[in-house]
Amino acid sequence: MANERLYGPKTRIGLASVFHFADWQNPTAAEMNEISGGIDMTGSIWDLSCALDLDNTTFDLGDSDTDDELSFCQWAGSANPTEYNPEIVYTAFRATEPWIVSDPASLNQANAAFHLLAWRGVEYYAWVSVGKEPGEAFAVGDRVSLMRVETDFGIDDVSTGGNSKISQTFGFKSQILWNHKITA
C-alpha cells in the first residue's frame, strides 16, 4: 500500500524462554508459531511488537571488535570479528493496570511486556523478524535473528504529558543467530 509507513508494520519482535527451542541455532517455523500473542504468560515465546516503542527500541549489532592482524595468506584490509557487540534495548509502553494478571480481560501486550522486562536476572532469547506483520504465522524461508540475553532492572520512563514506558537494556549472553533463514 502506498501510504504504509516505511518501518512498519512489517516487523515482529519479542522474547522466548531459553528452554523454548530444541536447537537455538535452528529455530523452526512451528516453534516460532507457538507465540502466545503476548498475553498468555504461561507460554514460552511472546510477540511484543505492539507494546514496544519504535523510536526507543534497538535490536542491532554494534561495532564488533575485530582482529586486524594479517597473515601472508589474507587479503589486505580483511578483518575477522573476535567478539560481537549486540545492542538490544526494548522500551515498552506501560499498561494502565500492570499488576492485574488474574483478569484476562485486562491483559494485553503492554501487561506482558512489563512482566517480562521489569525483573533483573531473567534470561531470554530476544528475537526479531522483518518482512511480515505482527501476528502473521512464520513459514519456511522467513528470516529471524535471536540473541540470548539477560535482563537488568527495568527503568521507568515517566514524563509530563508523555506515555509511561519501561526500558530494558539487556546484557548479552554470547549466543547469537543473526538473519537466519528458517528451513523447517
Pin down the residues of each PLM region.
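Short, surface-exposed, charge-dense and proline/glycine-enriched linear segments
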Residues: 6-8, 12, 100-104, 170-172
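Solvent-exposed edge beta-strands and adjacent loop segments
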Residues: 2-95, 148-163
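Short N-terminal helix-initiation segments at or just after the protein's N-terminus
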Residues: 18-37, 103-118, 166-180
